[in-house]
Amino acid sequence: MNESESEIQARLLAQALPFMQRYENKTIVVKYGGHAMGNPELGKAFASDIALLKQSGVNPIVVHGGGPQIGAMLTKMGIESKFEGGLRVTDQKTVEIVEMVLAGSINKEIVALINQTGEWAIGLCGKDGNMVFAEKARKTIKDPDSNIERVLDLGFVGEVVEVDRTLLDLLARSEMIPVIAPVAPGRDGATYNINADTFAGAIAGALNATRLLFLTDVPGVLDKKGQLIKELSVAEAHALIADGTISGGMIPKVETCIDAIKAGVQGVVILNGKTAHSVLLEIFTEHGIGTLIVP
């Protein structure tokens, strides 16, 4: 006999129950970015996932990026994007626009989407409650001809040096869902633009989060046959980087996962944000849909 839609929904909810119990009162940090942010239907599905996590007793925290939107705004305002070693240079004028786009328009759009579900989201950035302090990023690049390393001056691109969890702990005890933009102050009074992945990792590490989810445009880490690897230890991840299985843009993503685990996160997942309800499919099903990296 074919199941009715209501019977299927009931069965799926019953299967999800043990996972709801497993993650009750646990912190899950979700880095939201990639294609999902530009798709209205995926955006609504993401917001409903976050709302359901909260309703299930989970403490969800959203960290978001916004690279394409920043680029579009800079173009609109006639400001040329400059790059050093493939990394965006953020001068004073640019960092003001970065803050406007990240902590302003994008942040509030995500907050509004979650609030439309009936939950209560609040938009923040690293400046709020002195949550995050940063310092100027120190990046180097090796000249392929001379093999000499030189230091890149990326302007107001920062790295997290301190996370104060006080505000986030207060919010965890409330009904509110934090949505955080990766902008933070330095002790020097400057404002810094921080890579959203590393920012999310720092937040998750400071909170000893049970899970950190990276929503990307790919299914996860793939083996040399192109098949999804469901779970990796840190040691196995290092080995796959060394033998070239993990390559290109996936290397910094996996390295960020490893750093987050070293900082205290219990498990980090790279998953496909282009799949509707990807967060629920990862958290509330037995095998998840991405690659789980564990200590």
UniProtKB/Swiss-Prot annotation:
Enzyme category, top tier: transferase
Domain of life, per lineage: Bacteria
Subcellular localization(s) per the UniProt record: Cytoplasm
Primary localization: cytoplasm
BP-aspect Gene Ontology terms: arginine biosynthetic process via ornithine; L-arginine biosynthetic process
Keywords tagged on the record: Amino-acid biosynthesis, Arginine biosynthesis, ATP-binding, Cytoplasm, Kinase, Nucleotide-binding, Transferase
Cross-referenced InterPro entries: AceGlu_kinase-like_sf, AcgluKinase_fam, ArgB, Asp/Glu/Uridylate_kinase, Glu/AcGlu_kinase, NAGK-C
A molecular-function term among this protein's GO annotations: acetylglutamate kinase activity
Pathway this chain belongs to: Amino-acid biosynthesis; L-arginine biosynthesis; N(2)-acetyl-L-ornithine from L-glutamate: step 2/4
Feature type site, description Transition state stabilizer: 31, 253
Catalytic activity: N-acetyl-L-glutamate + ATP = N-acetyl-L-glutamyl 5-phosphate + ADP
GO cellular component, one term: cytoplasm
Pfam families with a match to the protein in the record: AA_kinase
Enzyme Commission identifier(s): 2.7.2.8
Residues reported in the UniProt entry to bind substrate: 66-67, 88, 193
Family recorded in the similarity comment: Belongs to the acetylglutamate kinase family. ArgB subfamily.
Purpose of the protein: Catalyzes the ATP-dependent phosphorylation of N-acetyl-L-glutamate.
HAMAP family in the cross-refs: ArgB
Protein name in the entry: Acetylglutamate kinase
